Design a protein with these regions (language model features):
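Acidic-and-aromatic substrate-binding clefts and catalytic sites of carbohydrate-active enzymes
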Residues: 39-48, 71-81, 159-162, 202-213, ...
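Hydrophobic faces of well-ordered beta-strands that scaffold small-molecule active sites
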Residues: 30-34, 65-67, 97-101, 150-154, ...
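Aromatic-rich peripheral "rim/lid" segments of glycoside hydrolase catalytic domains that contact
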Residues: 42-46, 54, 257, 276-290, ...
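C-terminal motif of bacterial Sec signal peptides marking the signal peptidase cleavage site
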Residues: 14-16
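Substrate-binding cleft and catalytic face of glycoside hydrolase catalytic domains
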Residues: 56-175, 180-198, 204
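Boundary/entry segment of secreted carbohydrate-active catalytic domains
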Residues: 21-56
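Positively charged n-region of N-terminal signal peptides that target proteins for export
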Residues: 1-4
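Glycoside hydrolase catalytic-domain groove-lining segments
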Residues: 51-58, 195-198, 209-280, 292, ...
Length: 347
C-alpha cells in the first residue's frame, strides 16, 4: 500500500495541479453535506428543472461540500468510490471539500461507533495502523484525482469515542488512551497526505458544554486543528425540551467559549431544521446572525438538504426507519428559504 501512496504523491508533485475553488481557503464556508446525492439520482430523483443538484446549490451561494466515507457498507453507497465520484463533481463545480471519515461500515454517531467488520479482531496496535491506512487510502484517492480537500474529520460525532468498545469513553472515564490515539493517528496520516489540511474533531450538541471532553483529549495526546459541532435546534426531544431560542443562544455561547478556551476555530459541521415547519427559516436566520458575528466561527454545513418528497436510502427500509424529515428542498426539488438564508450568509 505504501508504494501506491508514494506513486500518487509523486504524480501530484509532477503535475502540481488541483481543481480551483470559487472561494479562497479559510473564507466563510457556506456548505452542504450531500452524501446521499448519488443514491438519490440512482433512484431517479430529479431536481428543479432537471438542474444538477450541485449546480443548483452553487447558484444560490454554496461554496463547500461535505462528504462522508464508510469503510465497506453493504450497498456501496458512501464507500470510498461513491465519495470520490461526488468529490470529483463538487471539485469541478469549484467547491471546497470536507471529508467526513466515519471509521465504520455505517453511520457513526454518539450512540453507534461500530468497528468495521473487517477490523473486528484487531488489537490496539493493529487498529491504529488500520486508522492510518484507511485515512491515507481515502485522502490519496482524492489527491490522485487532483482534488485537495480543505478539511477532514477524524470520526463523526465522537463525544463518546470511536471504534467501540476499544475506543469508547464515558465523560472523563473509559478508554481515553485508545480514543485519543486513534485521533492522533488519523491526524498524522491526514497531514502526511495533505500537510496543510485542517483536521477536525467533531462532536454533537453544539449547545452542550463539554470541558471534560477537550481536557481529556489534550491530556491523552489527541490532536485537532478545528472543532466541529452539530446543531439541530428544533429537536426538543433530543435537547431536553429546550426551545429553539434557548438552543441557538446556548450554541453561540458554547462556540465562543470553545474558541477562547482552545484557541482554534469552530465549524458547524452539521445543521438541520424540520422541512415542513414554517418556523424553520426564522430559526436558521437567528442562528446565522449569531454565528456570523463570531470571528473564528469558520462556516456552516446543512446536513443532506437535497432530500425531499419522502425519499429514503435503501438501508433505511430493512431497519424500519422513515424518511429524513429535515431536508431543505421544496416539493418541486428546489432549495427552500432555509437554504437561501444559509447559502447567502456572509461575514
Amino acid at each position: 500500500m505504501k508504494k501506491i501512496f508514494l506513486f500518487c504523491a509523486v504524480a501530484m508533485l509532477l503535475t502540481g495541479c488541483y481543481y480551483k475553488t470559487d472561494s479562497p481557503r479559510g473564507s466563510w464556508a457556506r456548505g452542504a453535506d450531500i452524501s446521499w446525492l448519488s443514491e438519490m439520482e440512482h433512484d431517479g430523483v430529479k431536481f428543479y428543472e432537471n438542474t444538477d443538484c450541485i449546480e443548483l446549490l452553487r447558484g444560490i451561494g454554496m461554496n463547500a461540500v461535505r462528504l462522508r466515507v464508510w469503510v465497506n457498507h453493504s450497498t456501496g453507497w458512501s464507500n470510498k468510490e461513491d465519495m470520490l465520484s461526488l468529490a470529483k463533481r463538487a471539485a469541478k463545480a469549484g467547491q471546497r471539500i470536507m471529508i467526513d471519515i466515519h471509521y465504520s461500515d455505517f453511520f457513526a454517531d454518539p450512540s453507534h461507533q461500530t468497528i468495521p467488520a473487517a477490523w473486528q479482531k484487531y488489537d490496539y496496535e493493529t487498529m491504529l495502523e488500520a486508522v492510518r491506512e484507511h485515512t491515507l487510502d481515502v485522502l490519496y484517492a482524492l489527491k490522485e484525482e487532483g482534488i485537495k480537500p480543505e478539511w477532514v474529520q477524524i470520526g463523526n460525532e465522537t463525544p463518546n469515542g470511536m471504534l467501540w468498545p476499544m475506543g469508547k469513553v464515558d465523560k472523563a472515564e473509559g478508554h481515553w488512551r485508545e480514543y485519543a490515539g486513534f485521533t492522533a493517528m488519523g491526524y498524522e496520516a491526514a497531514k502526511e497526505a495533505f500537510p496543510d489540511i485542517t483536521v477536525i474533531v467533531h462532536v454533537d450538541n453544539a449547545y452542550e458544554r463539554r470541558d471534560w471532553f477537550w481536557k481529556s483529549m489534550e491530556a491523552y495526546g489527541g490532536k485537532w486543528d478545528m472543532i466541529g459541532l452539530s446543531h439541530y435546534p428544533m429537536m426538543s426531544a433530543w435537547n431536553g425540551g429546550k426551545s429553539w431560542q434557548e438552543m441557538n443562544a446556548l450554541a453561540e455561547e458554547n462556540i465562543r467559549r470553545l474558541i477562547y478556551d482552545w484557541h482554534c476555530p469552530v465549524m458547524i459541521a452539521e445543521v438541520g431544521m424540520f422541512a415542513n415547519d414554517p418556523l424553520s427559516a426564522t430559526v436558521m436566520e437567528d442562528f446565522i446572525q449569531r454565528i456570523t458575528a463570531i470571528d473564528s466561527c469558520a462556516g456552516i454545513f446543512y446536513w443532506e438538504p437535497e432530500v425531499y418528497g419522502g425519499w429514503r436510502p435503501a438501508e433505511y427500509v430493512p431497519l424500519g426507519w422513515g424518511s429524513y424529515d429535515m431536508g431543505a428542498f421544496t416539493p418541486d426539488g428546489k432549495p427552500s428559504e432555509v437554504m437561501d438564508i444559509l447559502l447567502q450568509s456572509k461575514k
